[in-house]
Amino acid sequence: MLKTLENLQLFAHKKGGGSTSNGRDSQAKRLGAKAADGQTVSGGSILYRQRGTHIYPGVNVGRGGDDTLFAKVEGVVRFERKGRDKKQVSVYPVAK
């Protein structure tokens, strides 16, 4: 009887977990509008963060190297249509 127990092999009754190629996600880039239509902004304020030109710069608005739109002067923000299928954002100074 002892000889049969010597050859006894124990196997796992649950398989190993293994690995997966999922489980990662990039951080959100916080893109989109940073100023609303009709809002008063100061010069240099970021109006819209984007990748590419979803919205084009209008009056008194500049475009940064990463396509971010920013106000060149202090004024009121206006989101407008540019032709049939494009949009632009402009900043109009407030008359004092």
Swiss-Prot record:
Residues 1-11 form a propeptide. GO terms for molecular function: structural constituent of ribosome. It holds the Pfam family Ribosomal_L27. It comes from the Bacteria. InterPro entries: Ribosomal_bL27, Ribosomal_bL27_CS. The N-terminus is cleaved by ribosomal processing cysteine protease Prp. Signal peptide: none annotated. GO terms for cellular component: cytosolic large ribosomal subunit. Residues 13-36 are annotated as: Disordered. Gene3D superfamilies: 2.40.50.100. The keyword Ribonucleoprotein applies. Keywords: Ribonucleoprotein, Ribosomal protein. GO terms for biological process: translation. HAMAP family: Ribosomal_bL27. Belongs to the bacterial ribosomal protein bL27 family. This is Large ribosomal subunit protein bL27. The lineage of its organism: Bacteria, Bacillati, Bacillota, Bacilli, Lactobacillales. The gene is rpmA.
